[in-house]
């Protein structure tokens, strides 16, 4: 049986999710936590998909201007880790995205999935990394039963073009497909 990985404790407080990306990334770096997104499931044990999604919605809702939200997503994409080239394979590519986008699942023995993500375009990378973070450290059943309407709080209709919105829905379909797998 595999030994459960011990996680580093994070000096966490509720204000962290409303901090600027740079501030959160600095805290993560100071605590030697790498390859983690600002609202990360890797140090938020017990947070549900809905909790993490709501954290991102709160971050985006602090910005009145849609251009600020768009810029935040692109900055988030820039600061997010990249998927190693060896995983940029057709089987991990998300169909229906305007730019090449990869979503790589990492299944645990505890029936939990972690995701890593990348894209050739910054706005797509910001979205796919945010979704990867929201769904990481979740059970297959929680992922498979996620309701698409819960994304409404992200206000994608005003934020993204129809083509990019379709790409986000394709990303979610791929994520839910991994959650539905029986192997």
Give the predicted meaning of each segment.
Residues 12-44, 57:
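Intrinsically disordered, low-complexity regions enriched in acidic/Ser/Thr/Pro/Gln residues
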Residues 12, 119, 141, 146, ...:
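C-terminal binding/interaction regions
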Residues 2-10:
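Short Lys/Arg-rich cationic patches that frequently serve as NLS/NoLS or arginine-rich RNA/DNA-binding motifs
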Residues 112-124, 128-129:
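Glycine-rich active-site/cofactor-binding loop and its immediate structural neighborhood
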Residues 45-88:
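Extended low-complexity intrinsically disordered regions
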Residues 51, 55, 102-116:
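Short amphipathic alpha-helical segments and their helix-coil junctions
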Residues 85-101, 105-106:
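Structured beta-strand/loop patches that form or line metal/cofactor-binding pockets in enzymes
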Residues 127-139:
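Alpha-helical support elements that line or immediately flank enzyme active sites
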């Amino acid at each position: 049986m595999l030994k459960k990985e011990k996680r580093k404790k994070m000096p966490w407080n509720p204000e962290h999710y409303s901090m600027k990306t740079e501030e959160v990334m600095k805290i993560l770096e100071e605590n030697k936590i790498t390859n983690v997104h600002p609202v990360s499931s890797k140090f938020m044990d017990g947070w549900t998909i809905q909790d993490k999604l709501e954290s991102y919605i709160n971050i985006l809702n602090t910005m009145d201007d849609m251009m600020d939200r768009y810029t935040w997503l692109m900055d988030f994409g820039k600061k997010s880790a990249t998927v190693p080239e060896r995983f940029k394979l057709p089987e991990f590519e998300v169909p229906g995205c305007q730019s090449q986008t990869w979503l790589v699942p990492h299944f645990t023995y505890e029936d939990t999935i972690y995701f890593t993500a990348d894209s050739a375009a910054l706005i797509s990378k910001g979205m796919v990394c945010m979704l990867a973070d929201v769904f990481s450290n979740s059970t297959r059943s929680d992922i498979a039963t996620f309701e698409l309407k819960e994304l409404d709080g992200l206000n994608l209709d005003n934020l993204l073009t129809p083509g990019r919105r379709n790409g986000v829905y394709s990303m979610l379909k791929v994520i839910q497909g991994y959650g539905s797998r029986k192997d």
